[in-house]
Design a protein with these regions (language model features):
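Primarily recognizes the serine-hydrolase "nucleophile elbow" in alpha/beta-hydrolase
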Residues: 196-267
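Alpha/beta-hydrolase active-site loop
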Residues: 159, 181-203
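Catalytic-loop region of hydrolases
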Residues: 22-110
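Accessory cap/linker subdomain of secreted extracellular hydrolases
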Residues: 249-349
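Short beta-strand/loop motif that positions the catalytic acidic residue
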Residues: 214, 352, 357-364
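Short, surface-exposed "cap/lid" segments of acyl-processing enzymes
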Residues: 87-96, 100-161
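Short alpha-helix in the alpha/beta-hydrolase fold that links the catalytic acid
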Residues: 227, 354-355, 368-379
Length: 439
């Protein structure tokens, strides 16, 4: 059965509920909030031995596509793929995603480059997977709302002639496990292995000499930042030319406080669900401290997309989910083993490979600006090549998501321009020396 590990009671911490299908290629489809997940997303019983090995692939019809003058689809031709990665426990895991071959020519130096894009927060239900959103950019049903808001960044890269591979992350889309939201190792490994998988696809125009970039904002910013840190040890064969990390949740203790009580309070449930699945120390603490309302919320959130979570749990305080009336952050902080487990998720303890552009909105109160800035400081102290960009905007509303989302749009052009310069082989210089003067 499909184990969905939601932190509830000791009797149900590993399988809070089961979907009506096998984790392998069985006859019964998995249905998440009324959406039938294609059988493609059911992992096989046996996985390849090599990280990044392609398990299967198929054509992916893009929901937003037009015929070009030369007959080729614009902005490109997409392939849905499943590939092998390694999770935070060191176990083999199947991950899905998509590769898009652009119709536009690459006009920079060298062969066509590749960007591995890590999506921002989309939810924890399998129907929220970024690869499914490429096919259905706006999915509205009586039970769920999914919006493929990363399409703009993806298509802008494609229009520049850059090939793009998108990861669905561990457990998002694939029906055998729960999505481990903001898990440092899971997301970093999945992004790096997506690069490896893209190079194996038939018909892909990228070559072994193609430059590679990592790109992500919010959850995706954490994933790209993590991947840049992990590359030298986990994937030295992936040659990085640049990494964009926008609004990265590098310090989850601070980020939990920002999310709690916000419009995106449901994301707190996603992180707790994922860590309870992956880490016994956190699971034990959650089981001992979550009340009946909290158990129900964690289970309900585990199949939600962002829109569902905003409607279902917007502005909810996690103190309503605990037996003590304390916030989940305070509960974890009071338990040394649980806090240590959360601290292991900290990004900034390793030097990233290659140049990194880190952007953060100074008014961001969801993924707090201060912890994102601290990541830049931490990297600079390690001698990394960091371009830090503080996005100065007025306060657009406390806890409404606007302070977090608006910089995603306003900074996107500069982020893509910086990335394409790196992919063209242009040099960059760190502005770490300006950090004492930067907000």
């Amino acid at each position: 059965m499909r184990a969905v590990a939601v932190a509830v009671t000791a009797a149900a911490c590993v399988a809070a509920y089961a979907a009506p299908a096998s984790a392998t290629d069985g006859p019964q489809p998995v249905v998440s909030r009324g959406v039938t997940i294609p059988g493609f997303y059911n992992p096989p019983a046996e996985l390849p031995s090599a990280n990044g090995a392609v398990i299967r692939h198929e054509p992916l019809p893009l929901g937003l596509s037009l015929p070009g003058l030369d007959g080729r689809p614009m902005p490109g031709t997409a392939t849905r793929l499943m590939y092998r990665s390694t999770d935070s426990g060191g176990q083999a895991v199947a991950v899905t995603g998509a590769y898009i071959e652009p119709s536009a020519a690459w006009k920079g130096s060298g062969p066509r480059p590749l960007v591995a894009l890590a999506s921002g927060t989309v939810g924890q239900g399998d129907q929220c997977a970024p690869s499914l959103s490429l096919q259905h950019p706006l999915a509205l049903t009586p039970e769920t709302v999914s919006v493929g808001y990363e399409t703009l960044a993806i298509y802008r890269l494609l229009s520049a002639g850059v090939a793009v591979v998108v990861t669905d992350y561990v457990g998002l889309g694939t029906t055998d496990r729960l999505h481990t939201y903001v898990n440092r190792l899971d997301q970093g490994h999945a992004l790096l292995d997506a690069v490896r998988a893209a190079h194996q696809l038939p018909g892909a125009s990228i070559t072994p000499d193609s430059r590679t970039g990592l790109y992500g904002y919010s959850q995706g910013g954490g994933a790209s930042a993590s991947a840049a840190e992990l590359q030298s040890a986990y994937a030295p064969d992936v040659k990085l030319s640049g990494t964009y990390a926008g609004a990265p949740p590098a310090d989850l203790t601070a980020t939990m406080k920002g999310i709690d009580g916000s419009a995106l309070a449901g994301a707190l449930a996603w992180s707790i669900n994922g860590f309870a699945q992956a880490d016994a120390d956190l699971r034990d603490v959650v089981e001992a401290n979550v009340n009946d309302a909290g158990r129900a919320a964690l289970k309900d959130a585990s199949t939600m997309c962002v829109g569902d979570a905003i409607f279902g749990f917007g502005f909810t305080k996690s103190s309503k989910w605990t037996t003590s009336g304390k916030s989940l952050g305070d509960v974890i902080a009071a338990e040394p083993k649980a806090q240590a487990a959360l601290d292991r998720q900290r990004i900034g303890t390793l030097k990233p490979t290659g140049p990194v552009r880190l952007a953060t909105g100074v008014q961001d109160d969801i993924v707090p600006h201060t912890q994102a800035r601290q990541l830049a400081v931490d990297w600079c102290r390690k001698g990394a090549d960091v371009t830090y960009d503080a996005i100065v905007l007025p306060n657009l509303g406390d806890k409404l998501l606007t302070n977090h989302l608006v910089p995603l749009i306003t900074d996107q052009g500069d982020a893509i321009s910086w990335m394409t310069d790196r992919l063209s082989g242009k040099g960059t210089s760190s502005n770490c020396w300006t950090m004492p003067l930067q907000p």
